[in-house]
């Protein structure tokens, strides 16, 4: 989700042994550059680029297919949790959710994420939460690694 020009999917496609990667972005310019990036890096047999809104694409076309979903749009990832959950396999998987938060509110954000997921009749466990970068005094970009069961 929020694949952009492919910074995550290209590296994963080149360095891991996954069978298929779906990279979705709503921005047509990013999508064009993603397609070019896939060609340059010779990962077209692994990465399937999709132009569209993840909120619509995942529940309609990628239902229950993913072992792992990366959500690197810290401004809005929280709004897309339901779509991400619909993409995770019934047997479970991992969601990497990026968010901008006040660092001293980390525990309350974790509780909010867990409640949101559990409201969708899924169980979850926060495997880790890491500050990716500081973006202001007491304000940071954090990635939450969430196991969905």
Where are the model-predicted features located?
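Rossmann-like S-adenosyl-L-methionine
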Residues: 1-149
């Amino acid at each position: 989700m929020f694949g952009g020009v492919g910074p995550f999917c290209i590296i994963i496609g080149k360095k891991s042994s996954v069978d298929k990667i779906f990279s979705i972005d709503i921005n047509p310019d990013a999508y064009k550059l993603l397609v070019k990036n896939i060609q340059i890096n010779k990962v077209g047999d692994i990465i399937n680029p999709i132009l569209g809104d993840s909120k619509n694409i995942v529940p309609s076309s990628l239902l229950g297919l993913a072992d792992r979903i990366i959500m690197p749009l810290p401004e809005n990832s929280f709004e897309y949790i339901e779509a991400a959950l619909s993409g995770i396999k019934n047997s479970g998987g991992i969601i990497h959710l990026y968010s901008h938060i006040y660092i001293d509110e980390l525990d309350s954000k974790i509780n909010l994420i867990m409640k949101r997921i559990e409201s969708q009749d899924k169980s979850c466990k926060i495997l880790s939460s890491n500050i990716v970068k500081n973006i202001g005094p007491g304000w940071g970009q954090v990635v939450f690694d969430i196991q969905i069961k």
